[in-house]
Amino acid sequence: MSNETNANSTDSRQGVTNIGSVPAYLVLADGRTFKGFGFGAIGTTLGEAVFTTAMTGYQETMTDPSYHRQIVVATAPQIGNTGWNEEDNESHDGSIWVAGLVIRDLAVRVSNWRATTTLQEEMAKQGVVGIGGIDTRALVRHIRNEGAVPAGIFSGADAERPIEELVEIVKSQPSMVGANLAVEVSVDKPYVIEAEGEARHTVVAYDLGIKQNTPRRFAARGVRTVIVPAETPFEEIKQYNPSGVFISNGPGDPAAADIMVNIVREVLAADIPFFGICFGNQILGRAFGMETYKLKFGHRGINVPVKNHITGKIDITAQNHGFALKGEAGQEFETDFGTAVVTHTCLNDGVVEGVALKSGRAYSVQYHPEAAAGPNDASPLFDQFVALMDEDSENQKEEA
């Protein structure tokens, strides 16, 4: 169906538009515009335009809280083929966190036995604005060359306003630089994911935008996980007598997360085993005294090669980050907690992908070993954390 038609029609399902019937524009802050058709919710959404190279896993991507305030461009040519199910949500309550979705082609037929609804229906239900019919190859090249850029999707009546006016609306949105967004996606109160079988350890996990596959990974290893809100004071988590502390992935600028940095410094000073993922890697790095910076267009995909400079091993990883730590492969430096080292870097561009204390008491990676979606190459990082807690437990028994 042509996306040039002006008719705004809906089918028998409330709020679901017929593909191509609603005009829409993707507008970038630099003045570049793309005409397409609206789907999902109809209206306006603003966010930073970023792209993901993942060919699968759009549901996991869209429900990942790390994508808060970002309009995600899918490089896969067709999205929606597997519909939407109740099992693959990565947010705690099934919420979609992307600000908007940009695609080339919207699948009209769902082909997955687990699907309970379509992508378009779920987006309409949750009020998420999408635009299709876009030359995503040209758009991704533009973002790659010019960098992630503020953007807006305008569909329906909103798309009829003058382009100059839409550009000004896009320009007026707040920057990702300096944005402390983890508190906006975190839970309000603690909750527990029990271990499968007898619990060997209890881990306190700070929810800065945690994906649900993380506590699942812990549970499968006999670890009880207490998920606490971002910025929960260190003194409060002592009540759980944690064997280890975990900091999750999350959105925003790590340079604005001073409270979390100070909490991690308290954890390190108490010599409690520490593991961090993604945003947690940046927080640990800052606790070590490292600086962060914003990447030009970030790393987002499920096929990113990372080298472990301690073992020499290369993993294919899932990634989603727009900020990174400043450092070099194998770099060693002194911290208030002992000697630290840059353990991992990305083979594509040399970006820091992991740091650790040489003592082994604290470590983190920039990528997502929990996957969802993505490869499982890095899942042994969870085993490493459990082994560290096992060692502590054995030492405590010997001392007793």
Swiss-Prot record:
- Pathway assignment: Amino-acid biosynthesis; L-arginine biosynthesis; carbamoyl phosphate from bicarbonate: step 1/1; Pyrimidine metabolism; UMP biosynthesis via de novo pathway; (S)-dihydroorotate from bicarbonate: step 1/3
Could you list this entry's UniProt keywords, alphabetically sorted. Amino-acid biosynthesis, Arginine biosynthesis, ATP-binding, Glutamine amidotransferase, Ligase, Nucleotide-binding, Pyrimidine biosynthesis
Which reaction does this chain catalyze? hydrogencarbonate + L-glutamine + 2 ATP + H2O = carbamoyl phosphate + L-glutamate + 2 ADP + phosphate + 2 H(+)
Q: Which domain of life is it from?
A: Bacteria
Q: Name one GO biological process term.
A: 'de novo' pyrimidine nucleobase biosynthetic process
| Active site residues of this protein | 278, 368, 370
Which residues take part in binding L-glutamine? 66, 250, 252, 279, 282, 320, 322-323
As for what it does, the entry says:
Small subunit of the glutamine-dependent carbamoyl phosphate synthetase (CPSase). CPSase catalyzes the formation of carbamoyl phosphate from the ammonia moiety of glutamine, carbonate, and phosphate donated by ATP, constituting the first step of 2 biosynthetic pathways, one leading to arginine and/or urea and the other to pyrimidine nucleotides. The small subunit (glutamine amidotransferase) binds and cleaves glutamine to supply the large subunit with the substrate ammonia.
- State the family it belongs to: Belongs to the CarA family.
Task: Outline the subunit composition.
Answer: Composed of two chains; the small (or glutamine) chain promotes the hydrolysis of glutamine to ammonia, which is used by the large (or ammonia) chain to synthesize carbamoyl phosphate. Tetramer of heterodimers (alpha,beta)4.
Q: What is this protein called?
A: Carbamoyl phosphate synthase small chain
